[in-house]
Structures are given as structure tokens and as C-alpha cells.
Swiss-Prot record:
The name this protein goes by in its record: NAD-specific glutamate dehydrogenase
Bilayer-spanning residue ranges: none
GO MF annotation list: glutamate dehydrogenase (NAD+) activity; L-aspartate:2-oxoglutarate aminotransferase activity
Species annotation: Halomonas elongata (strain ATCC 33173 / DSM 2581 / NBRC 15536 / NCIMB 2198 / 1H9)
InterPro entries: Aminoacid_DH-like_N_sf (IPR046346), GDH_C (IPR048381), NAD(P)-bd_dom_sf (IPR036291), NAD-GDH_cat (IPR028971), NAD_Glu_DH_ACT2 (IPR049062), NAD_Glu_DH_ACT3 (IPR049064), NAD_Glu_DH_bac (IPR007780), NAD_Glu_DH_HM1 (IPR049059)
Gene name linked to the record: gdh
Length: 1613
């Protein structure tokens, strides 16, 4: 089939050529050339044709066609040229040779022989035999295939050859001339072939006619049969001539018989005569008749015809009738190939020689010796058999037989008959024979025999000996004298038995048994170059190193110094199995170790079962200092092996191994600190750091000593040892001249001191040191650490992976990212941990984040290989973190093994998934189990027995809470009202896919991911929802899978790789586009800035920045072409399901424009919150499992059963936090001052970095005040998170979490079924205090706002813990959670603004109540206080409207009616409307207790006094005071408290009045009449306040003073 296909391809090419011929030539000529082309190219390999351009094929065809047009068969034609397109019509990179000759044998072979003789590479040679017809002028008339015509046309051979290009014209002429000369020889030899055979027959006839008496009859008959045998195609005749014996002055001589020459002897007779003379030395010389009838000789000149071999002379004597020699016949030619394969016993003359030798030997042909001798003769060099005489043959053959398979060297030399050649037979043991030995033997023989090498052939059989025949030409006129025994001894020495020496050395080194086993593998393994360079004893040592190699140890080393070496030079041998080691792999390692490679010699050791390489390097230190071999050998070899194995990095730090006398692990430690310096943006390169350490070796060693003193568990540093070491370093630093060097070395010392723990001294179970390093650091001790500064940090470093884990506190949590930012992954993680810190405000742990990079990702790795390496690096990273983390066993802290700790107990380490590690939780938990970590599979949430965030849709649902709240504020119910959306992502994604299924009212008009753009200008909400659901349910999907039939008119799915996209009218309308075509990136930008209701980010990347930010500052190059500015956003709402979709400044800019947007860490906090719930739940139930009350299977089922409730708990946190943000936004518009002060105070305390968080300056905030602007939601998102984090931290440090009443907050994080079964266990939870603190902080900030605690701290002087306790008391005393839930239940039933107004009413009441409890100091416990006040407050709340008086009652009624009209239930409206008055109930209850009255009675008097003195009105005026600073705010709060206090004092006074009416109103009237003077003064003051003539704080200070006087007037009365 292949042949058919190739032939079809050839025909196709010729068809194309034919078409080209027809298009350019006339019809007849085109047909002729086409016929020729088919004949000429018939045998050309297809690949040679296919490589040709059609133009060149056409040109070459015509060129050769023209070449054969004129040809005289008597004159061979040769053309040599370099084809040039302009000159010849075709092009080739080679020199082209065309040969045209009358067809005959040997043409192609002889041309090739000549070209090879000239050293020319033949790239192509094609031969076509053509049947041609020519006219009398030798012009071509027709051409045909010889097989296709019976006409008697001449046969011509056309040869086309391509050889290496030769540009010199003279050289081209020389090639042409030499080929013509060869062709003449061929022509002459072939034309005389039959005449030469006739001469052979004539010789036979002549021999048969005469038989000289002196010739043995058998020899005579043998000569005749030999000539007959020659004529049986066993000899190729090349030349013939005859000689006759003449008498010349009494001496005989040979003279050529004129005109007897045939074949090549007819050509250039003088040259050939000289050639014959030099070959045979006969013509014209003194002739001495030979005893034999026939003789043989070799020509000393290579044949130029047929084969490049030395042709043979066969000389036959001629006799007269008297038996005298009268002349010679001489034939020149070559035995055909069959002769060399034929048994000599079948060849006349040779068979008699063989029989004669057997007779001389006297061995029986059937005996062992006879058979052996016959075999020797059978394989004896055939040419020698013809030329050697019987006696010499017998002597040589018997000498060979005498070797008898012994491993020895023997030499046999034969001189040819005419004294021109030596034929040397050398026998050597086969196992030592090699080309290299053959060359050395040849050189020795040439030197000893004064000869020139001619040829060789090798004979190998099953014998233990190899036979090499050397044909050597005499340099002189005659052979030199030689002693064959001495010469043989030299050959023996040359082929010296180095292997025997190896055996002896092996026996000495390993013992005889082991040595024999070793020799069975390595006897023939070492190459000649190795044997020349090294002794056998050295080889034994090298074999020891080779023996160290195996799968686990692919490299062995030997570091040594030659005896002859001096100074800094050393030698290194590398031993490697399999392939040689590329120099490019080794040289960088040498250089980084501080060594220069002076020379290298590789040796391949070919054992019987494997191949090994020895690389011997000559080295010197780069500083040329003398190296102490004994000191450096061990550390150097181990370091090299570790670097080779990839367990140590190959960089400039390795120079410290020799330069500072360190081992590889000490260098790894210093390198790891340098890597950390790079990550914290220390401004020195790694090479500079390495060079500096190397320049100060003493300081470097002291730094290593300091590290050892601090962390080596085997060290027991005495008192002051560490300080002494530090002192030595500082003393040495004083002598460092370079400021940069000094700074670097001091930073190293600082880093070592800032290190708290390390796994440097930990070993694996196999006893090996771990091949990665982990340092736990206190970053606050590191100068210039980039902000924000984490509380703790673990840096991991190895040749394979680097990573960092940053924590905001001891209990901290966050994901681990597979980063691709090798240069600054810590910067990336630091940015993420900053976001995580604020995101984690709602959960127990502080923010944490980790990231790692894979440093040795396989080049060109596919997805599977990439993932495999990523997992391996992740596993190393996890192990490193656990290596330096405490454990809890039986409730007791257990430090990690072989770790010296310079910090307190620290057992809490929890991780989570992040970019690139979404599926790695089970892997982390397996390692957690492997380490026996107390958290088990709570170590990494979301694993096989954890909560699957995608299945729960928890992140999307959490973000959707933000979306719903934003839209509720805009009067849109996302679950009932349709709204338009532009999305970032695709339905296969967690956040995007789940998010776009959270409402069937979504009209997704456009979306994009990294591959496609989806556009549906006027979608059907229900149908598109169902289609999105279908895509989401697919195992894998993309926008391409969307059913395009469901896409509305003008829409479509477009690849982002498209050059441009046509914009339809519908697209123009929905996205506000004017252009007819846009690039994909331009269309995406148009989608992002379009006027849609929602932009939903569920993808990866940053798409919105501030107009004041550059793309480079954003750090997301992939999306630079898409990114818009925040001010360009025209959507109403942004939902940030994904991270980093907008920069913080981009959010602020969008929010300032009116876009409703929080931040990513607010919107997508559901994921971390869910994970925190999982961890806390697992910690609880794992304790139950550990004591046997729950099986593992039951535990996992319980986790699954609680999924929905966990989701509800998480979403409730999202709901309330976004509610808190909206409330904070409203409050900031009412007065931004408290927020400004809050930021400033946090900043002053070092708890926030305003610049890092992009918070506005004081000046900007004051400017907003002037424009009645508040804080934006993105800014408040940051502040609310800090408010919670700071409060949480203070609460953990206080006794608040231990308060039995407040401790009940622990139950809030657990599903109800856990509370039902394991309530007691909740109060024993290991993180109980942290949970309580977190829940209290969340509750307080969610309902009381960002600045609540700060304001109370300022106004009361209380700390955060006391404020939180007072808040809980006030909250529960008023049973506010019930009211909050009722208000929250009104979502989509009343406007959000109404809900928020109610929340703010309760917030103000609760703030004052909290302050009241802070000041009263009841002396009761939290529980007792709540139990005392709660029921009394409940009583006072009943029918409170009836108790109010005057304007206060009117205000209550109006507010109640307003709320009821808005849709608020009457009961709730009544309670909330009274919020401003309810606060007073606390004082009323306290007064009732003091006066021993019932609270209801006290309340009646209280409200009556207030109404009569218009105290609610005066409090309103105080509240309306504008405050410009904190002092005025404190004063305002003081005025209100004082008025409340005085109202209670007046109430008590009225109640304590002796006598008087019972009715409240009458009793108050009576009391006022008794104090008429003071009363009138107060009334006058009210008039002044009401007139507004005198305002501000001084007036109210006077008013409060007057009220105090009125209250105190009772005593005077």
C-alpha cells in the first residue's frame, strides 16, 4: 500500500511538471520532454522529487534535456555546474553533475568511486538508461524506455549527481576532467573485456599444448583449471599485457611485447608502465625465472573502476618447446565477491596449497587438530592464500594453531613476492580488542617496519581471539630487518592486560570471590582512554563509587588531588548511571560552589548489565586560594549531591560551603533568610546577599552559631552564651567598612532574633533532616516590615516550594493560595490577609492568609502534571506549617518535636481553600491526621466530611444578601421584580453559577469570562433561568453550551479571540453603544459601563479601579484592556461574589457617584463564616467522638444533617452586617464627626493604617461635613470590620467571655440540634472565650454601629469590656433581640427607610441605656441585673402611651401613627415610638427601688414632672446641638444625662413630699407651688432657649444648673 501511495504521489508531481511544460513549450516539444521526464525520474526516490519546487524541477528537467540533445557515443559527456536560477533556470544548494555515456557496466560505481576518492559527499545519484535514436550528426531524434521498444536504438546511460557545493571554477573543471578520465578507463576496460577473456583462453590452450618438464604435472593441470575457473565469472578483467624474455649481454630481461596491451594498460601507457614497474619491479630489470608456473601479486594502487580496492596481478609463464621460459602473460583485475565467500577447497591452486599444508602437518582430517588447522586455512585471508607459498603458509597456520584459544598476543609477518608489502596477522584476545587498540597496533607496526599503512581487515568468530590483518607498504626499496619476537613483545605490551591488573587490584581490594563477580560485569567495561589515564588500582576505587549508584543515589562523587597538583587545584570525579551528564548541567553547579572548571574528561564504563559514566573535572577555586581537601571533602560532596538531587538550590550561596566552611544545610538556612528578605522587599539582590556573606566569612559563621545557640535542641547554651555570640557579631560588624554590608549583616542578626521557632533540626522517620525549612517569626521585630504587620508569620523555603503564612493573632484563619507571583508572593498574601482580617471580623479567628509558589514546575507540563506538582508543593507547605505548631493532646499543649520555642503556647492553626487550592482540603486534613493534629479534619474546612461551599452556594447566597439589601433600599424586591444584570463569570463557576440561580427574576443581558462573551439583550427571565440551571448542572460547561435558540434577537455568544464583533441594534440599545463594530475587549467595557440594575462579579480579576489609579498599581495585567474607572459605572448595584473585582478606591469612587456597593470581604464573607462554623462544630463534636459518645460515622452524618441550619446561621450574619452598614451610612450623613474621631483614635493607637485602607483624611471628612456628605459603604465596610476586630480582641483579653450570662452567646454559633444534644459541651469548647467575644462584638457593632463603643469610652471613661457588658445588660433588659427580629421580618413589607428609622430609634435608646448601666454600677451580677430590670421594664412598656404626658405623648402618638401607616404592626409601632421615652424607665426603676415605690407610680410622677417642666423638649434642643469636636460631644451627652438625672431627682422629691394629693398631676402642681420661685426661674430660662437669642453650649450649661438648683430646692423647703 505504501508503494502504491508513493507511486501515486510521483505521478502527481510528474503531472504538475507536465502541465508546466505544456504551458511553456509548444505541444510537440512538451510531449517529448514529458516522455523523457517520466523515463528520467522513474527511479528517483519520491522524497528527492518532493523536496523540489516545481520551478526547479521544471528547470532541471529542461537543463538535462538540453544536455542530452547532442552526444557522440565515442566521446563521454560530463557537465559540472552550480545551478543558478537566472543562468540555468533552476536552483540548487549543491553542485550538479550530469554524465552521458554509452550504456555499459561499472559506470555508476566508477563515478561514485571517483567522487568518494575526492572526498566529496554524494547527496543524490540517479541513473536512467535510455533507448535513443540519433541522426548522423548525433542529434537526438527520439527517446524511449529500453523495455518498451524493440527498435535497435542505442542504449545511453544518463547519470545525475548532486554533491557538496564547490564554488571554485577551477575545481569544477578538475572534477569534470577526472570523471572523463575514469570514464575512459571504464570504456577501455569494458570494450576489451572479451579480448582479455580471449587471452585467458589462449593461455589455457597454450598450457594445454606445452608442458615443461620442470613443472609438476599436477601444478600444470591446476593452472589450467584455475584459468578456467577465472573465466567462470570469478574475475573482473581490467588489463592485460605480455612480456618476452630477451638476452642482453648474457643476462635475461623482460621486455613488453609491443601492442599487446588490453584494457587500462592501453591508456596513457607511460603512466601504466611506471605503475606496473612499481607494482612488480620487472620491466627492463634483470629477470630471474620463478619456479612456479603461475604467480600472484597485489597492485599498490587502488582501482578506479567498479570497486575502490587493490586489484590483483596474475602472471602466467610462457614456455617454448624445450620448456624454457620465453615470456609472461599478465592479467590485472579483481576477484569477484563470490570468491571471498567460496571455500578455498573449491578454488584451483588454493585447494592444492591447503592439501599440501595438511600433508606437512600430518594431522588426520577427522582429528581435532586436523579440523582446527583446516578451519584456520578456510578463514585465512584469501588474497594471502593466493600469494603465500606452501611452506610459509604451513608455518603460519601451524603457528596460529599453536595459540590454541589461549588469551595471548601473536604476530605473523609475510613479505610479498615483489618486496613491496607486508601482510601482518595479529592475534589478540577478543575481549581487549577495540578500534583504539587496532590503531595503536597499526601505528606500532608501521613504525617498527618503516612502512605506510595500506589497509586492514578484522576477523571475529566464536574464538577468544580476534585476528587483524594489516597490509603495509614498504617505505624503502626493501624491507627493514626486524626481530619478530621483540616486535611481538611490544605488541603484547601495547595490548597489555590492564584487565588482569584490574582483576589483581580487585582481589586485593575486595577479595577473590567478590573480585570475580565484579570482573564478570566490569572486565571489559573501561574504555581505552580511561586505561591510559588511570591505573587499575584507581579503577578499583572508582568501582567502589560506581557500586554506590542505585535508583535512590543516581550520582556518586570522588574529590581528590593528583600528586602532581599544587596550589588551588583539585579533581572531582562524578559517577553517573545511564546517559552522560551534560556539561551545561554541571558547570553552573561548579561555578556556584566557587570553582572554576579547568578541564574535563568523560569516560563511559560499559558494564555487562548497565552503562556508567565517569566525568573527571580539574578544578580550582575562583579566588585561586589553596583548598584544604580534608576539610572541604565531606561538606562539598554532600552539598553537590543535594544540589544534584534537587534538595538544595543551585545558586551563589553555595560558595559559602568552601568560602565560609559551612555545610549545605547551614547554607540553606542563610539562603532561606535571604529569600525572606526578598519577600519583605529588602533592597538587595540575592547575589549581592550571597556575595556579602561570602566576603565576611567570620561573621557568617557567627550568625550560624547564633542560630544554633537559639534553636538547636541538643545545645544547652549557658547563661550569657547567646548574648556573647551577639556581642561577637556586633564587634565584628564594627570592622565592616561598607554600610550596605553592615546593614545586611545586622538584618540577618535581627531576623534570627525575630525567629520564634524553626523545624531546622527536625528529622523524618528515616532519620534524615527535612528537605524544607520553616521559620516562625515575630514580624514586629523586623525593621521596615511592610504594613500591615501581622502578629505571627511562618516562612517556608525549599528548592521546590516557597511560601508564607501570615496571621493576625493566635486564633486566626484564612485560605492558602497557590500563587504564581514568584517575586512577591508575600506582598500578594499581605494584601489578602489585610482583606481577610476585615472579612474575619464576623467570625472567631482573626484574619490569616497563606500562599506558596511552585519553583520547579516541569517545563511544558500539561494540566495533570501541573496539578500533581501543585499538590506536592501544597503538601510540603502544610507539613512545614504543622512542623512548628503546638498540638493539644488530652487537653495539654504538646510542643513540636525538636523545636526550641521562643514564644508562648500556640496550638491553633486552621487553613482553608483559596485560589488554586479549592480541592485540596482533604489533602490538608490527611496531613493533619498524619501529624495527629488536634483539629483533625477541622484543620482544613470543606473536605470530604465538611461543608461543600459550592453545593451549599454559601458564598453566592451571602453576597446575594448584600444585593437584596441594596435593591430593597431602592424599592426593588429581587425575588419578585425583574431586574437586569451584567455578570462576570460563567455558569460552571461556584459564585457566578450559584448567584445567577438565586432569583428567577434575573434578566442576564450580558456576561463574560476569559473565553466568551454572552449577550442576551431582552431575555425571557424564566426561560433563561432554566437554561442557566441546565448549564450549572452540567459536569463542565461554558457559555458555548448555552442554547442559542433561547437568546433574544440581536444577541449571541462571541469568542474573545475574535478580531471584532458586529454590534446589533439591540446590543446598542441595552449597552448604550454607538459603534457598529467593537473588539471583544471594547464590548466588555461597554457592558461594564452600561445602565443595568446589577453588575454581579463571580469571576477572577480586577475590572474596576479608581480614575486616580493606574493599571500597573492594580496588578492584574490580564485585564488591563477591560478595566474601567469607578466613576464610569452606571449600574445601580454591584454584588461582589468574587474577590478583588474592584479596587477599594474604585469602589469608593463608584459609591460616591451613587452606586450601591460594599466590598468583596463584606459580600463574600459567607464562605469564611461557613468554614468557621464548620471548624467550631467539629471541635465540639470531635470531643464527643473522642470520649466514645459518638461514632465517626454518626459524627459525619450529624454534620451533613446540620447543613441547612449552618447555612441559615451564616446568612444571618451577612444579613445583619449589611444592615449595620446601611445604618452606619445613614448615621454618618447625620454627623461624620464621630467617624472622623474613630479613625483618628484607631490610627493613633496603631490599630489602623489610614493610607493602607484608603480612608479619607481629616480634611476630606471635614469637607464632607460642609457638604452634608457621609461615609461611603466601602469605607464603612472597613471601619465596621476594624470596630469588630478591635472589640473582639479586647473582649478576649478581658473577663467578659467568662461571665456566665454573656457566655450564653456561645450557643448562637451552633445549630439548634447541637444545642439540644450537647449544650453542656458547648460551654467546654476549646474556643469558647473566642466564640463568645466574637458573637458579642458582632451583635454590638451590628446593632449599635461603628462608633458606639468609641463614643461611650470617650463619654464615660469605661473600657471596651465594661461597655460590652453594659450593652448586653441593656440589650437583654429591654429584650431588644425580639424587637429587632420583628423589624427585620418587615423586609419587602415596609420601605427599608422605615425599618432603618426604627432601628435607629432603638439604637439611640440602647446607647443611652448602656451608658446608664455603666454609670450606675448596680453591684449586681450581669444575670441578676437583667433579671431585676427586665420584668420591670416589660411592665413599664405596657400602655406606655397612656403614661406619657404633654408634648412627649403627642410625639409618641405621631410617630406611632407614622409607623402604622407605613405598614408596621401596631404593637411594634407603639413600642418603637416610645423608644425615646423608654430609656427613662431605667432611672424610674432605680428610683422606685430607692424610694420603695412601685415603678408604675414613679413613672406617672416622672412623666408628669417632665411634661410640666418641658424636659423632653429641652433634651431635644440639647440633642440638636451641633458638635465640632469630641469635647462638645461629651458635653452634649453630659447635658442629657444631667437632665435625666435631675428629672429623676425631682420625681423622687415629689414622691417624698409630705402629705399632698395622691393624683400625680395634682401632686406635681403642689410641689411646684411650694417652689414657685425656682419654678419661675426655670420657666424664664425655657423662654430664652425657645427664643434662640442665646444658643449653644453655654446656655444649656446654665439651664442644667438651673434644673439642679430646682431639684435641690426641696431640701431648702
Amino acid at each position: 500500500m505504501l508503494h502504491v501511495a508513493q507511486e501515486e504521489a510521483r505521478l502527481d508531481l510528474l503531472k504538475q511538471l507536465k502541465e508546466r511544460l505544456q504551458s511553456r513549450l509548444d505541444k510537440d516539444k512538451a510531449a517529448e520532454v514529458d516522455t523523457f521526464a517520466h523515463l528520467f525520474y522513474a527511479a528517483v526516490p519520491l522524497e528527492d522529487l518532493a523536496d523540489r519546487r516545481l520551478d526547479d524541477l521544471y528547470g532541471a528537467t529542461l537543463s538535462v534535456w538540453h544536455f542530452i540533445q547532442q552526444f557522440d557515443p565515442e566521446a563521454p559527456k560530463v557537465r559540472v555546474l552550480n545551478p543558478d536560477f537566472e543562468e540555468h533556470g533552476w536552483q540548487s544548494t549543491h553542485t550538479f553533475i550530469a554524465v552521458l555515456h554509452e550504456d555499459m557496466p561499472f559506470l555508476v560505481d566508477s563515478v561514485r568511486v571517483e567522487l568518494n576518492r575526492r572526498g566529496m559527499t554524494v547527496h543524490a545519484i540517479h541513473n536512467a538508461v535510455l533507448a535513443v535514436g540519433r541522426d548522423d550528426e548525433h542529434r537526438l531524434q527520439r527517446v524511449a524506455s529500453p523495455e518498451e521498444t524493440d527498435a535497435p536504438e542505442a542504449r545511453e546511460s544518463l547519470i545525475a549527481i548532486e554533491v557538496d557545493r564547490h564554488s571554485n571554477p577551477a575545481e569544477l573543471e578538475e572534477i569534470e576532467a577526472s570523471l572523463l578520465e575514469v570514464l575512459r578507463e571504464v570504456r577501455t576496460a569494458v570494450s576489451d573485456f572479451d579480448p582479455m577473456r580471449a587471452q585467458a583462453r589462449a593461455a589455457i590452450e597454450e598450457l594445454e599444448a606445452t608442458r615443461p618438464a620442470q613443472v609438476d604435472p599436477a601444478d600444470h593441470r591446476e593452472a589450467i583449471e584455475f584459468l578456467q575457473w577465472l573465466l567462470q565469472d570469478n574475475f573482473t578483467f581490467l588489463g592485460y599485457d605480455e612480456y618476452e624474455v630477451r638476452e642482453d649481454q648474457g643476462r635475461q630481461r623482460l621486455d613488453k611485447v609491443q601492442n599487446s596491451e588490453l584494457g587500462v594498460f592501453r591508456l596513457d601507457q607511460p603512466r601504466y608502465r611506471e605503475r606496473i614497474r612499481t607494482d612488480l619491479g620487472v620491466e627492463g630489470d634483470h629477470y630471474v625465472p620463478m619456479p612456479q608456473l603461475m604467480s600472484f601479486a597485489k597492485s599498490a594502487h587502488h582501482a578506479r573502476i567498479h570497486r575502490p580496492t587493490y586489484p590483483d596481478y596474475i602472471s602466467i609463464d610462457r614456455y617454448d618447446d624445450q620448456g624454457r621460459v620465453i615470456g609472461e602473460r599478465r592479467f590485472l583485475g579483481m576477484f569477484t565477491a563470490t570468491v571471498y565467500n567460496e571455500s578455498p577447497r573449491n578454488v584451483p591452486i588454493l585447494r592444492r596449497k591447503l592439501q599440501a599444508v595438511m600433508d606437512i602437518a600430518g594431522f588426520s582430517p577427522k582429528g581435532h587438530n586436523g579440523k582446527q588447522l583446516l578451519q584456520i586455512l578456510e578463514v585465512y585471508p584469501r588474497d594471502d592464500l593466493f600469494q603465500i607459498d606452501i611452506e610459509e603458509l604451513a608455518q603460519t597456520a601451524l603457528g596460529i594453531l599453536d595459540i590454541r584459544e589461549r588469551r595471548r598476543v601473536r604476530l605473523f609477518i609475510r613479505e610479498d613476492t615483489f618486496g613491496k608489502f607486508y601482510s601482518c596477522l595479529v592475534f589478540v584476545p577478543r575481549d581487549v580488542f577495540s578500534t583504539e587498540l587496532r590503531v595503536r597496533l597499526q601505528e606500532l607496526l608501521c613504525e617498527e617496519l618503516d612502512a605506510t599503512f595500506g589497509d586492514f581487515n578484522t576477523y571475529l568468530s566464536e574464538s577468544v581471539l580476534a585476528r587483524i590483518q594489516f597490509i603495509l607498504r614498504f617505505n624503502g626499496e626493501k624491507p627493514v630487518e626486524y626481530d619478530i619476537k621483540r616486535l611481538e613483545e611490544k605488541l603484547v605490551k601495547l595490548a597489555r592486560n590492564w584487565r588482569d591488573d584490574l582483576l589483581n587490584a580487585s582481589i586485593e581490594g575486595f577479595g577473590e570471590e567478590s573480585a570475580n563477580l565484579l570482573m564478570s560485569r566490569f572486565r571489559d567495561a573501561f574504555p581505552a582512554s580511561y586505561r591510559e589515564d588511570f591505573s587499575a588500582r584507581t579503577a578499583v576505587y572508582d568501582l567502589q563509587h560506581i557500586g554506590e549508584l542505585d535508583e535512590g543515589a543516581p550520582l556518586a562523587l570522588s574529590l581528590y588531588r593528583l600528586i602532581e597538583e599544587e596550589g588551588s587545584g583539585v579533581n572531582l570525579k562524578l559517577f553517573h548511571r545511564g546517559a552522560p551528564i551534560p556539561l551545561s548541567d554541571v558547570l553552573p553547579m561548579m561555578e556556584n560552589l566557587g570553582l572554576r572548571v579547568i578541564g574535563e574528561r568523560p569516560y563511559e564504563v560499559q558494564a555487562s548489565d548497565a552503562s556508567y559514566w565517569i566525568h573527571d573535572f580539574n578544578l580550582e577555586h575562583h579566588t585561586s586560594v589553596e583548598m584544604n581537601l580534608q576539610e572541604m571533602r565531606g561538606p562539598f560532596i554532600e552539598a553537590f549531591q543535594r544540589i544534584w538531587a534537587g534538595e538544595a538550590d543551585n545558586d551563589a550561596f553555595n560558595r559559602l560551603i568552601i568560602g565560609a566552611n559551612l555545610d549545605w544545610r547551614e547554607v540553606a538556612m542563610l539562603r532561606a533568610y535571604a529569600r525572606y528578605l526578598k519577600q519583605i522587599r529588602f533592597g538587595m539582590s540575592q547575589d549581592y546577599i550571597a556575595t556579602t556573606l561570602g566576603s565576611h566569612p567570620e561573621i557568617t559563621r557567627e550568625l550560624v552559631s547564633l542560630f544554633e545557640l537559639r534553636f538547636d535542641p541538643a545545645e544547652r547554651p549557658g547563661e550569657g552564651d547567646i548574648e556573647e555570640c551577639e556581642s561577637r557579631i556586633l564587634t565584628l560588624l564594627d570592622e565592616v567598612p561598607s554600610l550596605n554590608d553592615d546593614q545586611l549583616l545586622r538584618r540577618y542578626m535581627e531576623l534570627i532574633k525575630a525567629t520564634l521557632r524553626t523545624n531546622y533540626y527536625q528529622r523524618t522517620e528515616e532519620g534524615r533532616y527535612k528537605d524544607y525549612l520553616a521559620f516562625k517569626l515575630d514580624p514586629s521585630q523586623v525593621s521596615g516590615i511592610p504594613k500591615p504587620c501581622p502578629a505571627y508569620e511562618i516562612f517556608v523555603c525549599s528548592p521546590r516550594v516557597e511560601g508564607v503564612h501570615l496571621r493576625g493573632g493566635k486564633v486566626a484563619r484564612g485560605g492558602l493560595r497557590w500563587s504564581d507571583r514568584h517575586e512577591d508572593f508575600r506582598t500578594e498574601v499581605l494584601g489578602l490577609v489585610k482583606a481577610q482580617q476585615v472579612k474575619n471580623a464576623v467570625i472567631v479567628p482573626m484574619g490569616a492568609k497563606g500562599g506558596f509558589v511552585c519553583k520547579r514546575m516541569p517545563e511544558g507540563a500539561d494540566r495533570e502534571a501541573t496539578q500533581k506538582e501543585g499538590i506536592a508543593c501544597y503538601q510540603i507547605f502544610i507539613r512545614a506549617l504543622l512542623d512548628v505548631t503546638d498540638n493539644l493532646v488530652g487537653g495539654e499543649v504538646v510542643p513540636p518535636r525538636d523545636v526550641v520555642r521562643h514564644d508562648d503556647n500556640d496550638p491553633y492553626l486552621v487553613v482553608a481553600a483559596d485560589k488554586g487550592t479549592a480541592t485540596f482540603s482533604d489533602i490538608a486534613n490527611e496531613i493533619s491526621t498524619e501529624y495527629g493534629h488536634w483539629l483533625g479534619d477541622a484543620f482544613a474546612s470543606g473536605g470530604a466530611n465538611g461543608y461543600d461551599h459550592k453545593k451549599m452556594a454559601i458564598t453566592a447566597k451571602g453576597a446575594w444578601e448584600s444585593v437584596k439589601r441594596h435593591f430593597r433600599g431602592l424599592g426593588v424586591n429581587t425575588q419578585e421584580d425583574e431586574f437586569s444584570v451584567v455578570g462576570i463569570g460563567d455558569m460552571a463557576g461556584d459564585v457566578f453559577g450559584n448567584g445567577m440561580l438565586l432569583s428567577d427574576k434575573i434578566r442576564l443581558v450580558g456576561a463574560f469570562n476569559h473565553l466568551h462573551i454572552f449577550v442576551d439583550p431582552t431575555p425571557d427571565a424564566a426561560a433563561s433561568f432554566a437554561e442557566r440551571q441546565r448549564l450549572f448542572d452540567m459536569p463542565r460547561s461554558s457559555w458555548e453550551d448555552y442554547n442559542t435558540e433561547l437568546i433574544s434577537e440581536g444577541g449571541g455568544i462571541f469568542p474573545r479571540s475574535a478580531k471584532s464583533i458586529t454590534i446589533t441594534p439591540q446590543m446598542k440599545k441595552v449597552f448604550g453603544i454607538r459603534e457598529d463594530k467593537l473588539s471583544p475587549n471594547e464590548l466588555i467595557r461597554a457592558m461594564l459601563v452600561s445602565k443595568v440594575d446589577l453588575v454581579w462579579n463571580g469571576g477572577i480579576g480586577t475590572y474596576v479601579k479608581s480614575s486616580e489609579e493606574t493599571d500597573a498599581e492594580v496588578g492584574d495585567k490580564a485585564n488591563d484592556a477591560l478595566r474601567i474607572d469607578g466613576r464610569e459605572l452606571n449600574c445601580r448595584v454591584v454584588g461582589e461574589g468574587g474577590n478583588l473585582g474592584l479596587t477599594q478606591r474604585g469602589r469608593m469612587e463608584a459609591a460616591a457617584k451613587g452606586v450601591r456597593v460594599n466590598t468583596d470581604f463584606i459580600d463574600n464573607a459567607g464562605g469564611v463564616n461557613c468554614s468557621d462554623h464548620e471548624v467550631n462544630i467539629k471541635i465540639l463534636i470531635d470531643e464527643v467522638v473522642s470520649r466514645g459518645d459518638l461514632t465517626e460515622k454518626q459524627r459525619n452524618q450529624l454534620l451533613a444533617d446540620m447543613t441547612d441550619e449552618v447555612s441559615e446561621l451564616v446568612l444571618l450574619d451577612n444579613y445583619r452586617q449589611t444592615q449595620a452598614l446601611d445604618l452606619a451610612e445613614l448615621l454618618s450623613r447625620q454627623g461624620i464627626g464621630p467617624y472622623r474621631r474613630f479613625i483618628s483614635e484607631l490610627e493613633a493607637a496603631g490599630q489602623i493604617d489610614r493610607e493602607l485602607e484608603f480612608l479619607p483624611s481629616d480634611e476630606e471628612l471635614l469637607e464632607r461635613t460642609q457638604h452634608n456628605q457621609g461615609m461611603t459603604l466601602p469605607e464603612l465596610s472597613v471601619l465596621i470590620s476594624y470596630a469588630k476586630s478591635v472589640l473582639k480582641g479586647d473582649l478576649i483579653a478581658s473577663d467578659v467571655p467568662d461571665d456566665p450570662t454573656i457566655m450564653r452567646f456561645v450557643e448562637r454559633v451552633f445549630p439548634s440540634m447541637l444545642a439540644e444534644r450537647y449544650r453542656d459541651e458547648m460551654y467546654e469548647h476549646r474556643l469558647k472565650r473566642e466564640i463568645v467575644a466574637t458573637q458579642v462584638a458582632n451583635d454590638l457593632v451590628d446593632y449599635m454601629g461603628v462608633v458606639f463603643v468609641r463614643r461611650l469610652m470617650d463619654s464615660t471613661g469605661a473600657d471596651r469590656a465594661d461597655i460590652a457588658r453594659a450593652y448586653v445588660i441593656a440589650r437583654d433588659s429591654f429584650q431588644l433581640p425580639r424587637l429587632w427580629e420583628q423589624i427585620e421580618a418587615l423586609d419587602n413589607k415596609v420601605p427599608s427607610q422605615v425599618q432603618y428609622s426604627m432601628m435607629l430609634d432603638l439604637m439611640r435608646m440602647l446607647r443611652r441605656s448602656t451608658r446608664w448601666f455603666l454609670r450606675q454600677r448596680t453591684g449586681m451580677s450581669t444575670r441578676d441585673t437583667i433579671d431585676y430590670f427586665a420584668p420591670r421594664l416589660a411592665q413599664l412598656q405596657e400602655n406606655i402611651g397612656k403614661r406619657l404626658r404633654g408634648e412627649e405623648q403627642e410625639q409618641w402618638s405621631a410617630r406611632r401613627q407614622e409607623l402604622v401607616k407605613a405598614g408596621v404592626p401596631e404593637a411594634l409601632a407603639s413600642t418603637v415610638a416610645a423608644a425615646g421615652s423608654l430609656y427613662a424607665a431605667l432611672g424610674i426603676i432605680q428610683t422606685a427601688r430607692q424610694t420603695d415605690e412601685k415603678p408604675q407610680r414613679v413613672a406617672e410622677i416622672f412623666y408628669e414632672v417632665g411634661a410640666r417642666l418641658e424636659l423632653p423638649w429641652i433634651i431635644q434642643q440639647v440633642t440638636r446641638l451641633e458638635v465640632r469636636d469630641g469635647w462638645q460631644a461629651k458635653a452634649r451627652d453630659t447635658f442629657r444625662d444631667d437632665i435625666d438625672r435631675q428629672q429623676l431627682a425631682l420625681t423622687a422629691s415629689v414622691l417624698g413630699m409630705d402629705g399632698g394629693p395622691r393624683d400625680s398631676a395634682e401632686r406635681v402642681d403642689r410641689w411646684l407651688s411650694l417652689h414657685e420661685g425656682m419654678h419661675q426661674r426655670w420657666r424664664h430660662l425655657l423662654e430664652e432657649v425657645g427664643s434662640g437669642s442665646q444658643g449653644g453650649f453655654p446656655l444649656f450649661a446654665v439651664a442644667v444648673r438651673e434644673l439642679v438648683d430646682l431639684a435641690e430646692s426641696n431640701s431648702e423647703a
